[in-house]
A protein has these predicted regions:
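M16/MPP (pitrilysin/insulinase) zinc-metallopeptidase core fold and M16-derived inactive scaffolds
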Residues: 23, 47-110, 176-179, 293-309, ...
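Active-site-flanking beta-strand signature of metal-NTP-handling nucleotidyl enzymes
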Residues: 46-49, 262-267, 432
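Short strand-connecting beta-turns/loops that link adjacent beta-strands
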Residues: 40-42, 202, 258-259
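Gram-negative bacterial Sec-dependent N-terminal signal peptides
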Residues: 1-20
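Charge-rich, well-structured scaffold segments of protease-associated domains
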Residues: 27, 84-235, 253, 263, ...
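His/Glu-based metal-binding/catalytic segments typifying zinc-dependent metallopeptidases
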Residues: 149, 166, 235-296
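Mature N-terminal segment immediately following signal peptide/propeptide cleavage
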Residues: 20-51, 55
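Short acidic, Pro/Gly- and aromatic-enriched capping/linker segments at domain boundaries
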Residues: 18-22, 246-248
Length: 452
């Protein structure tokens, strides 16, 4: 059994390295980077265009403009009418969409490989020739405001998380919601969106990731043909905003119509800045897997099944970002239990790791689970493009993705115990509590993915 497990891990590690073994890269004269990962398992191709611009680059009073511009990118150019982009991709037998984060904005198409040239032409066209029409903007800003109502204002958990971030970060722009504050959306104009586009949507602030059944030399030639003629432009200097050190616990209580209370404990946590030299982010990722990486992990086993103090309990930690990091413990108390009971139980589980450490068996299983999840990401062409694009977006080299897996596998039980002692302290803690209020009779509308 032990030999079978070891073989599976080694095989998975080998597959991970192979999956990212052949990316090829070139940089056009205008500064646009083209990254190609050949994968000939299926006759399809994925194109992802990543702009190094997200909500973190916005200013107070203009929150949400990055996301609004993402919507406007589907409203046409002089040669492609409003909504025509989606129709052409669908007619080619493909799918497309886009997403905005704190750190980047990305657009993708997955199409039969022979249609790659068509979607490359479409993306190159809107990279510099977007039409920001005032009437189209007025319609789309209403769509975005409704999206905010659905995803945040009518979603108590999302509202709590938004308020927590606004308190946890006092100076850094991560305090602002990606979708924007409603007042900023109400006062935003087409000129604001156009200024954002003109400033940041240039080849030297973007990179293109293409994966699939393609030849990298042929892709480079297509990129030169369609993206090459676009002119680059000097970018404004980005002034880094440093978050002041937190000097005590902060608490946020949100009252909203809901059936159940929710608790979130948010701790300031390190971010991966150097893949080779850093160690704590890997150990925290492993700790998260031990606490909440599978059905038999500590939170589910102890808090949900055995002690029945929680209906659910989990942990969220992303160790890559342009800005500062947070680690969140969260849950909903069981019937007859309070938020205070749940907070005490979560703290007790962290204290147990701090005092007793973790077992070799737990660490072994967590490593296997983490490795399996990473391999799963790389199983699809879209997943490979996402993995490459996201790591580049936060300033880390995609060439070292396999090194990240190696570093995870080297995390020791002592490393896990050390980070539990180091980062779970109350001076770096923000506590958020959702206090449920009587339901108002309005239907609680679930958030839905926006289709452009």
């Amino acid at each position: 059994m032990r030999l079978k497990y070891l073989s599976a891990v080694l095989l998975a590690a080998g597959l991970a390295t192979a999956a990212l073994a052949n990316p090829y890269e070139t940089t056009l004269a205008n500064g646009l980077r083209i990254i190609v990962k050949e994968d000939h398992r299926a006759p399809t191709a994925v194109q992802m265009v990543w702009y190094r611009i997200g909500s973190t680059d916005e200013v107070d009073g203009a929150s949400g403009v990055a996301h609004v511009l993402e919507h406007m990118m589907f409203k046409g150019t002089p040669s492609v009418g409003p909504g025509e982009f989606n129709k052409r991709v669908a007619a080619a037998g493909g799918r497309d969409n886009a997403f905005t984060s704190r750190d980047y904005t990305a657009y993708f198409q997955q199409v039969p490989k022979e249609k790659l040239e068509d979607v490359m032409q479409l993306e190159a066209d809107r990279m510099r020739h977007l039409t920001v029409d005032a009437k189209e903007f007025e319609q789309e800003i209403k769509v975005v405001m409704e999206e905010r109502r659905m995803r945040t204002d009518d979603n108590p958990q999302a509202k709590l998380f938004e308020q927590m971030n606004a308190v946890a970060f006092q100076a850094h722009p991560y305090r602002r919601p990606i979708i924007g504050w409603m007042n900023d959306l109400e006062t935003m104009t087409a000129a604001d969106a156009k200024a954002w586009y003109d400033t940041w949507y240039v080849p030297n602030n973007a990179y293109v990731v293409i994966t699939g059944d393609v030849d990298h030399k042929a892709v480079f030639a297509l990129a030169e043909k369609y993206y090459g003629p676009l002119e680059g432009r000097a970018l404004p200097a980005r002034k880094q905003q440093i978050e002041p050190a937190q000097e005590g616990t902060r608490r946020v209580n949100v009252k909203a119509p809901a059936e159940l209370p929710v608790l979130i404990l948010g701790y300031k946590a390190p971010i991966l800045r150097d893949i080779d030299k850093d160690s704590d982010p890997y150990a925290l990722q492993m700790l998260a897997a031990i606490l909440d990486g599978h059905d038999a992990a500590r939170f589910n086993k102890k808090l949900v099944r055995e002690d029945k103090v929680a209906l659910s309990a989990g942990i969220d930690y992303d160790n890559t970002a342009r800005g500062p990091g947070m680690l969140y413990l969260h849950g909903t108390p069981s019937e007859g239990k309070t938020v205070a009971d749940l907070e005490a139980a979560l703290r007790a589980e962290i204290a147990r790791v701090q005092q007793e450490g973790v077992s070799a068996a737990e660490l072994k299983r967590a490593k296997a689970q983490l490795l399996a999840s990473e391999i799963y990401k790389l199983d699809s062409m879209f997943g490979q493009a996402m993995e490459i694009g996201q790591i580049e977006a936060v300033g880390l080299p995609y060439q070292k993705l396999d090194r990240m897996l190696e570093k995870l596998q080297k995390v020791s039980a002592a490393d896990v115990q050390a980070v539990a002692k180091k980062y779970f302290n109350d001076d770096a803690l923000t506590v958020g509590v959702l206090e449920p209020q009587p339901l108002d009779g309005k239907p609680r509308r679930p958030g839905v993915a926006t289709r452009h």
